[in-house]
Amino acid sequence: MTEKATPSPEAIKAWARLMRVSRQLVESVEDALKEGGLPPLAWYDVLHELAEAGEGGLRPFQLIERTLFAQYNISRLLARLEADGLVEKLPVTDDGRGQTIRITAKGRETRRRMWTVYGRSIAELVGGKLSADELKMMSTLLGRLRDPPVLD
């Protein structure tokens, strides 16, 4: 990047739309989850990663790497999930202070119920408004904005 990099009008417009649409989509999903009496979307992200990890679970630092949470946020969220019986913390045998986080049966059921609402929201808010080709193009373009880029 150059010292005096100034965004083009097109870059500013794209950025503004990306930020606004992202916020609107997340708010719509959050509203749908709340109407369904379900936990916030952030819970789904953690439960999903833990379910994908299987019985071995994940260490907190691995969850931070796989999600968008800062360390202090993930600690509070994990405490809440544990208090609600959705995850369990297990000691790491070769690390006296370390813990592995594993999803419980209740956590799997909560994730399943959340996905019913979340998946429907994705289908309506994104899949129902764009063609398959448009979705593929959007996925490709957004992948290029990632760091590092996702090229699939």
PLM ranges: what are they?
Residues 1-36, 136:
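N-terminal leader segment of winged-helix/HTH proteins
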Residues 1-9, 132-152:
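C-terminal regulatory/oligomerization modules of transcriptional regulators
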Residues 10, 14, 42-43, 106:
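N-terminal positioning helix adjacent to the helix-turn-helix/winged-helix DNA-binding module
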Residues 25, 29-32, 67, 110-129, ...:
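Alpha-helical linker/hinge and terminal dimerization helices associated
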Residues 27-73:
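N-terminal helix-turn-helix DNA-binding core of bacterial DNA-binding proteins
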Residues 48, 76, 140:
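DNA-binding alpha-helical recognition surfaces that contact promoter or target DNA
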Residues 60, 78-79:
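Short, hydrophobic-biased segments on the C-terminal half of alpha helices
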Residues 79-137:
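Charged, amphipathic alpha-helical coiled-coil/dimerization segments
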